[in-house]
């Protein structure tokens, strides 16, 4: 997967390539899809959600420019695969999932695989996780129509926010925001297609740990 799907498509960061080679993607897909786990395409994981294709996971991880001591926020835990990749590189990963059942399953899988530097919370990803801000990087794995202001506010200086932006009926663009001492720099890159970032059932949510 690393050589054929990632290096050939321009992924160069060694930490990202090593993480992608180490994390067992088959543990993050439903059992009937295990044989398809290492194909470069998204797969359904239930509740209308998907696990992103490996190239997209690698691209977002590389674009975030994560350093070994970094604190990272992920919005859209899904099955936990992106969080596991981030946890191989960063010191701390905080991840928020709107679907409680997915959050519980992701936490269970991450625990079974020994990831002790990941904290999972079920809640509204639009609000981020302000109690642990600022974050050196924020990775959003579902598409909002506009970038939520709370996520921008929770980004550390020199931090990077990686997010697909757009509606389900128009082109979405992978977008990179960088916070500099002088303000925010926004860069739109290639077209993508992600499930929408939802914010249903607003209420107080508690961490699972």
Labelled PLM ranges:
Residues 28-29, 38, 43-45, 129, ...:
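Short clusters of hydrophobic/aromatic residues that line enzyme substrate/ligand-binding pockets
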Residues 166, 173-209:
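Substrate-binding/catalytic lobe of Class I Rossmann-like enzymes that use SAM or dcSAM, i.e.
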Residues 1-35:
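N-terminal auxiliary segments of SAM/dcSAM-dependent transferases
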Residues 65-185:
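Conserved nucleotide-cofactor-binding alpha/beta core module
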Residues 26, 35, 44, 183, ...:
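Active-site/binding-pocket entry motifs
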Residues 46-47, 136:
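Extracytoplasmic beta-sandwich strand-turn segments characteristic of Greek-key/jelly-roll folds
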Residues 3, 7-8, 32-33, 37-41, ...:
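Conserved alpha-helix/loop element of class I SAM-dependent methyltransferases that forms part
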